[in-house]
């Protein structure tokens, strides 16, 4: 069993990241080499888009806010939660004073960021069971949402165990030692990473995250992921 744990936590991580990076580069090259569309979907008279307006449309979804305010709330919560989650993972690797404007220990939010993401994903998932979204959905949409839900669930369980259940066998130092050893290409698994009471949550979290990175491009999931809502 320890051999399986090691494969998931070390070689599979390198494989998943390698596949994801390679897939990203291939997709970028295809986009750059692809033919440019001679026409656009803009309505005449065409107005030149300003970069501030483009950023506003990209990050704040004004059209969704006007037509589907409830969906907009969950979209904002989901995307803000993802940013905070990304920062939290960075803080497991490095001490980043920039993010300590509000003093906190990783992760920011005391466990509620993960809870917010889980509720948002459930909203996106159940929304796909109703018309007209159901008719526009494909199985891949459900698979991605369920996979993301499980990744965040097991990751949040590790945070909740430490914060809410006072079950801190896997410490922040253990996580940091594990991540930094991977980045340095000198992988070393702390004892608690595979032998503590809730090490299975770390292993499942990493295993599912690996699957997500590996299959992200094989199932043409870039578009599906960006249109989860």
Give residue ranges: language-model regions.
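Membrane-embedded alpha-helical bundles of multi-pass integral membrane proteins
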Residues: 2-229
């Amino acid at each position: 069993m320890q051999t399986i744990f090691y494969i998931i936590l070390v070689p599979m991580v390198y494989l998943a990241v390698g596949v994801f990076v390679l897939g990203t580069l291939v997709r970028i090259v295809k986009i750059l080499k692809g033919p440019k569309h001679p026409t656009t979907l803009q309505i005449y008279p065409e107005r030149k888009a300003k970069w501030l307006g483009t950023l506003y449309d990209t990050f704040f979804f004004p059209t969704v806010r006007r037509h589907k305010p409830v969906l907009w709330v969950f979209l904002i919560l989901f995307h803000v939660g993802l940013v905070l989650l990304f920062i939290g993972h960075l803080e497991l690797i490095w001490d980043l004073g920039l993010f300590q404007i509000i003093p906190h220990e990783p992760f920011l939010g005391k466990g509620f960021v993960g809870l917010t993401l889980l509720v948002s994903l459930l909203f996106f998932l159940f929304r796909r069971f109703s018309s007209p979204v159901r008719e526009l959905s494909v199985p891949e949409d459900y698979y991605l949402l369920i996979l993301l839900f499980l990744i965040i669930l097991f990751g949040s369980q590790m945070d909740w165990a430490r914060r809410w259940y006072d079950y801190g066998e896997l410490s922040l130092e253990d996580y940091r030692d594990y991540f930094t050893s991977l980045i340095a290409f000198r992988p070393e698994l702390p004892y608690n990473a595979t032998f503590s009471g809730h090490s299975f949550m770390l292993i499942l979290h990493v295993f599912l995250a690996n699957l997500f990175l590996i299959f992200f491009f094989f199932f043409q999931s870039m578009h599906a992921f960006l249109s989860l809502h």
